[in-house]
């Protein structure tokens, strides 16, 4: 790229930075005063004219200044060289806050609250998707000789408890056998494979009497746990931050709030996050949703080195501190994965 193009990008970068900070359209005079661009105000005016002709900035009808367009923000994000690093104190605080979570629900609630505070945007965290979860442990506890409590724990920390009513009583030896049979069928398997395994057990042993009947009944109940609750869930935090930026959305704030409440659009965008550590920025129409026009979404996946648990990120106006937001989303995702993976 030639020097004139590089200079114009520096002008664009300055316009984005100032507009994000001030919410006011930016003129050439203020750019020269605030930034060491090394050229005259006349040159900056010419560069702004070129940027406007190429669709990177535009002039609000009520102002003599310019503001970035979606195309301008995209160019700015694509050419980001430095993402604002979090301080070591901030990183330690994030890690400590998340590690204090008592279970999966608490960790994710803490994460969404923390991300909303860090970015001053709406934070969204998807519950771990069942399709990628692995059964870490199955516990079977006798409440009575004919009534069992089964607890399924996944690698992401998801816990599901089910009661099994047996047709007959079983003794401690049979309980140990039942626990071993079910554990071998489930533990270490992806939930999709585990559901097939218990379905086979249920069909083979259901109604066989004694231990076989107990295994069949338990497998049938487990199948409900593994298969029936596949709906995706989303946690939201900081929704009030949208109203703080209401002027950025024009008249579309209501439709944005409705999209967040319905969750379908956000879950679709988060479902595309398949790689932990990679942050995706969607600006304006890139969300492919009319309800989300005027917003940007910065998102990533969280999980371990080998397993993606779900997606997370923030939704806010296109007038967003992209370097700071990208850093915050990446950091919180990293620590969620570490905390859940260590449990």
Swiss-Prot record:
<protein>
    <recommendedName>
        <fullName>Heat-inducible transcription repressor HrcA</fullName>
    </recommendedName>
</protein>
<comment type="similarity">
    <text>Belongs to the HrcA family.</text>
</comment>
<dbReference type="InterPro" id="IPR021153">
    <property type="entry name" value="HrcA_C"/>
</dbReference>
<keyword id="KW-0678">Repressor</keyword>
<keyword id="KW-0804">Transcription</keyword>
<dbReference type="InterPro" id="IPR036390">
    <property type="entry name" value="WH_DNA-bd_sf"/>
</dbReference>
<dbReference type="InterPro" id="IPR029016">
    <property type="entry name" value="GAF-like_dom_sf"/>
</dbReference>
<keyword id="KW-0805">Transcription regulation</keyword>
<comment type="function">
    <text>Negative regulator of class I heat shock genes (grpE-dnaK-dnaJ and groELS operons). Prevents heat-shock induction of these operons.</text>
</comment>
<dbReference type="GO" id="GO:0005886">
    <property type="term" value="C:plasma membrane"/>
</dbReference>
<dbReference type="InterPro" id="IPR002571">
    <property type="entry name" value="HrcA"/>
</dbReference>
<dbReference type="InterPro" id="IPR036388">
    <property type="entry name" value="WH-like_DNA-bd_sf"/>
</dbReference>
<dbReference type="GO" id="GO:0045892">
    <property type="term" value="P:negative regulation of DNA-templated transcription"/>
</dbReference>
<dbReference type="GO" id="GO:0003677">
    <property type="term" value="F:DNA binding"/>
</dbReference>
<keyword id="KW-0346">Stress response</keyword>
<dbReference type="InterPro" id="IPR023120">
    <property type="entry name" value="WHTH_transcript_rep_HrcA_IDD"/>
</dbReference>
<dbReference type="Pfam" id="PF01628">
    <property type="entry name" value="HrcA"/>
</dbReference>
């Amino acid at each position: 790229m030639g020097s004139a193009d590089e200079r114009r990008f520096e002008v664009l970068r300055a316009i984005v930075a100032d507009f994000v900070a001030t919410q006011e359209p930016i003129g050439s005079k203020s750019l020269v005063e605030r930034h060491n661009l090394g050229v005259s105000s006349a040159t900056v005016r010419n560069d702004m004219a070129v940027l406007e002709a190429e669709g990177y900035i535009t002039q609000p009808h009520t102002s003599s200044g310019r503001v970035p367009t979606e195309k301008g923000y995209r160019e700015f994000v694509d050419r980001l060289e430095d993402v604002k690093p979090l301080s070591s104190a901030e990183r330690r605080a994030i890690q400590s806050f998340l590690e204090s979570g008592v279970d999966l629900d608490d960790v994710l609630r803490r994460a969404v609250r923390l991300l909303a505070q860090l970015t001053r945007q709406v934070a969204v965290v998807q519950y771990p998707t069942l399709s990628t979860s692995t059964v870490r442990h199955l516990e079977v506890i006798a409440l009575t000789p004919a009534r069992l409590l089964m607890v399924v724990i996944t690698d992401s920390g998801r816990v599901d408890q089910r009661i099994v009513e047996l047709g007959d009583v079983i003794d401690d030896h049979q309980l140990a056998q039942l626990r071993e049979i079910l554990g071998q069928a489930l533990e270490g398997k992806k939930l999709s494979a585990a559901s097939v395994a218990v379905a086979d057990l249920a069909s083979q042993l259901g109604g066989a009497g004694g231990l076989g009947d107990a295994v069949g009944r338990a497998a049938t109940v487990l199948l409900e746990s593994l298969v029936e609750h596949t709906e995706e869930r989303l946690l939201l935090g900081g929704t009030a931050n949208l109203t703080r930026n209401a002027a950025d959305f024009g008249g579309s704030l209501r439709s944005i709030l409705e999209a967040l409440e319905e969750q379908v659009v956000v879950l679709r965008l988060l479902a595309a996050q398949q790689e932990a550590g990679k942050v995706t920025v969607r600006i304006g129409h890139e969300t492919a949703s009319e309800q989300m026009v005027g917003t940007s979404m910065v998102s990533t996946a969280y999980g371990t080195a080998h397993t993606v648990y779900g997606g997370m990120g923030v939704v806010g106006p296109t007038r967003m501190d992209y370097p700071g937001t990208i850093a915050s989303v990446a950091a919180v995702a990293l620590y969620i994965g570490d905390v859940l993976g260590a449990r």
